[in-house]
Amino acid sequence: MRFSLHPLSTSDLKALEASQFPEGFSGRAVPDSMPPAFVASRALQLEAAAEAPPVPTSYLIVRLEDSRFVGACGFKTGLGERRVEVGYGVAPSAQGQGAATTALKLLAEVAFSSGSTEVLAEVAPDNIASLRVVQKAGFVLVGERRDEDDGLVTQWVLRSGA
């Protein structure tokens, strides 16, 4: 299957922050494909902190065969920084089809074209599916840290030109 990214506008993120579907999205979204309200809120804060974001910071993952939204992904830190952090999630019904791997590769392209040289993804060591995603996308394990919310996470980096 093939996938692409659909950028989320500020108005889309505001609707998601209010736990509502953005206009025109409800018929295209598979169950559990929309980002949670706290993710939309973080994206709005990130966009507000940037004077004028050159590119969107948040995206929906689109399955091209039927144009349905199957997940979401985006940047957790500002584009243009040397290292940017990304996050992603795919609806259970669409997992195992390459959506997250493709989305991660496309996010890395956006990051590198915006001046970043490294993309960071943090993954819980027991999240086998996500560990496979970062490995398939070309990320390399560089360390681990204890997150106050998520506990132990492994840190995976993809460098520009890798």
Give, region by region, the residue ranges found by the protein language model:
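Short coil/turn segments at alpha/beta junctions that flank glycine-rich nucleotide-binding fingerprints
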Residues: 97, 114-117
